[in-house]
Amino acid sequence: MRRDRALDALNFFLADVRDGLGPYLAVYLLAVHGWDQAGTGLVLSIAGIAGLLAQTPAGALVDGLRARRGLLALAAMAVAGACLAIPLWPGFWPVAAAQLASGAASAVFAPAVAAITLGLCGRAAFTRRTGRNEAWNHAGNAFAAAAAGGLSLWYGPIAVFALLGAMALGSLAAVLSIPADAIDNDLARGRKVGLPTAAQPSAWATLTGNRALLAFAACVALFHFANAAMLPLVGQKLAQQDLNRGTAMLSLCIVGAQLVMVPMAMLVGARADAWGRKPLFLAGFAVLALRGVLYTAADDAWWLLVVQTMDGVGAGLFGALFPIIVADLTRGSGHFNVSLGAVATAQGIGAAASNAAAGLVVVHAGYDAAFLALGGLAALGGLLFWWLMPETAASSAVRVASG
C-alpha cells in the first residue's frame, strides 16, 4: 500500500535527522577543532536538555494538531538547518545555540511518527507496524553511517553534514507523500473512537495518576543514562587512536549495531504480543550492563567495534518496545502523544545526564571507570524494571500464545 511504503521511507530517511549529528559531532569537534572531552560532552548535553524540555509540550502539540505531517516536516528542516550551521560557526556558543535549536525541534519526531502510525494502522496492528517502523529506522541509520564512513575517508568529518541535509530532504518528501485523509485523528491520539471529550481523563491525570507509567518513565531514564554516553565515548577513544580513521571506525560501530537492531525490531513486531513486553525489555537492560563491562577488557579498535555492535540488541529492543508500552499504558485516554512526550522527557534527562557525567568521569578517572559506572546503572535499571513494572501486553494475547 502507498501509505505503508511512505511510512517506510519516512522512518528510513528520518533516521539520520531525528538525532541530529549525534556522536559524529563529538568526533568532529575533537578531531577538527581540538575540543576536550568535557566541552564536547557539554554541548551534546545541551541538545539533550533542549529536547527534554520540549518533549512533553511537543507531545501535547501532536495530540492537539491535525496537521501532524506539516509539523514533522518543519521539525526535520529545523534540525537540518541548525546542524548545517555548525561548520560555519564552530565556536562554543554558536555550536551550543545550534544544539539547542536542534534538540528542541527533534522532540517532535517520536510523538509525530507514533501518532501518524497509530492513526493509519489502528491499535490492533500497532505492535507489528511499530516493529516495522523501527526496522526501517535502523536500516536508515545503517545506511547513513556507512555513507558517512565512506564519505569521511574522502572528504573528512565534514561529510556527515552534507549527508544529514540530503536525508532531511528525503524525509520531507516521504512525509508529504502520506495521505492526510488516511490518518484517523481519534486513533492518532489514542482516544476511544466516539468517546465524548468530557469523558476523557485530563492529560495531567493521565501523567500523574498512572503509577505504571511513572515507573516506566524512571526505568527509561536509567536506560538512557547508562546507554547514551557509551557510543560518544567509544568515538572519542577511536579518534584519539587515529584522527584520520576515527569517523570511519565510528561509522563501522554504528553500522554494526544498526544491522543488529533491524532483526531485533522485527522480533518485537512479530512476538511482543505473544511473549509479552517485559522479558524483551529486561533482555535489553541485561545486554546494556554487559557492554559496560566488556568495553574495559581491551582498547583495540576492533574489540570496541565488536562490543558496540551489541548495542543493537539492547537499543533495538528498547526502541521498538518504547511506544508500544506507552500505548498499552494509555489506551483509550486520548493522551497517548503527550504521555509519549513525557516519558521521552525522562529519556532525555537520562541521556543529557549521561553525556555530562561520563565526560567528567573520563576527565577525572578515565574511560574504564566511566564504562563501568554506566554498566552498573544499567543493572540497577533492569532490577527496578523487573520489580516495578507489570506486564502491559493484553493478557488474552499472552494466554493464547502460551496455550
Regions picked out by a protein language model, each given a short descriptive name:
Residues 54-67, 264-276, 362:
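Helix-to-loop junctions at the C-terminal end of transmembrane segments
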Residues 42-60, 255-267:
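Central cavity-lining transmembrane alpha-helices of secondary-active solute carriers
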